[in-house]
Amino acid sequence: MKLSLVLIIYRSDSSIALEASKFCEEVLKAKNIKSNRIASDFHRDEIEKNLYNTKFQPDIGIVLGGDGTFLKCANALADYDIPLLSINIGGNLGFLTQEKDFLFDKSFIEILENEEYIIDSRNRLNCNVCISERSPEKKIIKSYDALNDFYFKSVEEAISPTNQIQIEIDNEKVNEYKGDGLIISTSTGSTAYSMAAGGPIVHPSIDAMIINPICPMSLASRPIVIPNTSKVIIKPVKKSKGEIKLWRDGSKCMTIKETYYCEIKKGKAPCKIIKFKKSTNYYNTLIKKLDWKGDLSLKNSKN
């Protein structure tokens, strides 16, 4: 890959990420590659300024932080078709990031120049918040995109976490979940909040949506995996509080009133993630990040 301009985005609350961004800038400069550096607490207009008020659009974005930093950048940049290289600087699990050694030993430049990487396109979800009206044309109030997940929780979570949510899949009313909330996840997001709530781990190459209730009051309410070509409708049930709160990739979006509904489906623009061929594969990542031990009986057996 020939690089002319790189957008560097670093985790705003991390001094380590700030220093790493300066180091990255110097490495690129030594190769005569221009770069723009911004913190992850950017506003949307700042991104547009970096993309449109320059002569050239960035060839790639380099994200320095953890998965949380990457998720914000992914949702801001995916619509512009810019591949993202995420390097784990100060993050925790880091399922979406490369190891920091690639940055500090400067090997990331060689890998990019020699094209020793793949571009992994990850599907996102789109959520349209609409007003429930009898009109044949839906009225969209707000639209959001998510790489990991959307989830719905009580508006009074600290006082009364329980809510009741109705779900329809492809125009079929499927269930009413009563509990602490509901997660709609991509395959990529299956190792995030959904996994913590007892959902299945789904390989990111599988085009799927995971519907996972959070602490449901019925044992019959189980996670289900559906094709990501499905259309999912979420509505708050009147007989509960009549309102629920919508979250996206760990960030609060808005309150869904009893006269609203959410239409969730596959997003239009995928997120393009640069993955180095030298980095560990998906299963090794699971073993490392989740501290899996493998077959302990084999380790204890005598030959």
Curated annotation (Swiss-Prot):
The keyword Transferase applies. The active site is at D67. Transmembrane segments: none annotated. The keyword Nucleotide-binding applies. InterPro entries: ATP-NAD_kinase_N, ATP-NAD_kinase_PpnK-typ_C, NAD/diacylglycerol_kinase_sf, NADK. Its main location: cytoplasm. NAD(+) binds at D67, G68, K72, N148, D149, K178, D180. Belongs to the NAD kinase family. Pfam families: NAD_kinase, NAD_kinase_C. It is an enzyme of class 2 (transferase). Its EC number is 2.7.1.23. Involved in the regulation of the intracellular balance of NAD and NADP, and is a key enzyme in the biosynthesis of NADP. Catalyzes specifically the phosphorylation on 2'-hydroxyl of the adenosine moiety of NAD to yield NADP. It comes from the Bacteria. Its cofactor is a divalent metal cation. GO terms for cellular component: cytoplasm. It catalyses: NAD(+) + ATP = ADP + NADP(+) + H(+). Keywords: ATP-binding, Cytoplasm, Kinase, NAD, NADP, Nucleotide-binding, Transferase. It is found in: Cytoplasm. This is NAD kinase 1. GO terms for molecular function: ATP binding; metal ion binding; NAD binding; NAD+ kinase activity. HAMAP family: NAD_kinase (MF_00361).
